[in-house]
Amino acid sequence: RDPATTVMTTAAASWSPQPEGLAELVELFRQSTSTEREVQRRIAHRLDAISQIPDYLNYLVLVFVQMTGEEVSTRSVAGLLAKNHLYFNAPRVSPESLAFVQHMILPALSFSDTVLRNVATQIIAVLMQVVKPVNWIDGLSTLTQAMDSSDLNEAEAALSTFAKISEDMPEELDACEIQGMRPLDVLIPKLLHATAHAD
């Protein structure tokens, strides 16, 4: 078993949210759809304060991936905040949090809702930029397999994610191997096939 996978699984298993903090965040995400300027200002101020806690990213990803009883709008806000937090604050994110996100995020590619799947592809693409493809071979391997999924939504989301990664970091992707093959050697024929069969 890949040692990185063991680390990710351990990180996911050993973390659990504080119920009060989780409840507050979910309520903030629910209110974030308000068009009232004062409500938006208060939410932004509170989220800015909460974002300083070390495991803030874990909470965001947990809400996005696991809180299936919440509205799509609530979960998508959490997901987009997770993507932005990763993008703008990567140096502040602990290895444990990165491992937690790596463990949690890939199943989101098979979400039935288009909005949530699109957010998942954005999170995974940014996460790959942060951790680098060579350090997340399991993630690349899962994406490669998902492109052949019988679930067309999952296959399309995986393909979209892979295309974004190859656009953002072609050299890093080209330096990797998955079972003896370069990811781009797998991706390019699939992209050509998808383009040929596009509606």
Model-derived regions: residue spans:
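Short, Lys/Arg-enriched N-terminal segments with co-localized hydrophobic residues
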Residues: 1-7
